[in-house]
Amino acid sequence: MKPAAVSLAKLGENGLLHLLTARWKTDPSRVLAGVGDDCAVLRGEGKNSYLLFKTDAVVEGVHFKPGESPELIGRKALARALSDLAAMGAAPVAAVITLGVPKDESVRRLSAIYSGLKRIAKKYSVNLVGGETVRAKQLFLNVALLGECRGYRPVLRSGARAGDLIFVTGRLGATQARRHLLFEPRLAEGEWLARQKIATAMMDLSDGLGADLPRLARASGIFFHLDFAAIPCARGATLHEAINDGEDYELLFTVNPSRTNTLRKKWSFATPLHCIGVMGARDVESRAPLLAHGFDHFKQR
């Protein structure tokens, strides 16, 4: 399909990414994972040493409303990128921030946004080491984040196998309760799952279970069976919202059945675990009509 022959609304986010990156080439001796995972992964100098790169943007009117707390806007900008590191089991190292801002923006508001950034950076030991400012029609922040795995491999989306059980952390569907501004990235949980070699595949739920589980299945080349009754809905959320609203930032991961007892016995975090299905060798996605969309930046909903 020629790019000019289709609109973004029809192509969708996944289609656009494929169109733009289909001809990219990487050096496998240096690059473990590129387009298609939560972060890009480069091989480090030592054995089992990896560097992870992530860039993520928050835009006024898309990721936050004009009247939201500026401290929480800054917090969310970094927390989103941290969640992607968590999804691969990595520890954060440093970040640079690009700020796009209208020339009549309040300096007090900008100062509060950066206070929120600094607070969460301190909490998760992220060094804020630079950035850029640019005039823009509307406020946005872009975070470029560096992480690392030392002594263990990051968890990719592509490692799930038929028979692996599907787990999520926490509860889903709390976007309307402002959890998208207040969530905690599951860094400790993700790193533990990677170090213990328990998760066979993993990602974070940024666009919703309805969009992200099919992505993980496609990356692994298999399908899935969902137990809809087991999906953990946040208080006040419907099943449809839990599946499709997005911005949960919980971990979605798969586990070999032989490791599930170890997972449950050694899981020492307050974050609850929920088994919601199993990866399968047959296509059963068509039996799941509630997997409607998830969030897509471009498709009409």
Question: What is each of the regions a protein language model found here?
Answer:
Residues 3, 8, 184, 196, ...:
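Acidic, Ser/Thr/Pro-rich beta/coil linker or hinge segments at domain junctions
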Residues 51, 58, 91-176, 278:
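Glycine-rich anion-binding loops of enzyme active sites
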Residues 70-94, 115-123, 192, 210-216:
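Small-aliphatic-rich amphipathic alpha-helix that forms the alpha element of a beta-alpha
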Residues 104, 181-248, 280, 289:
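Active-site-proximal betaalpha loop/short-helix elements
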Residues 107-108, 154, 258-265:
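Short, conserved charged micro-motifs
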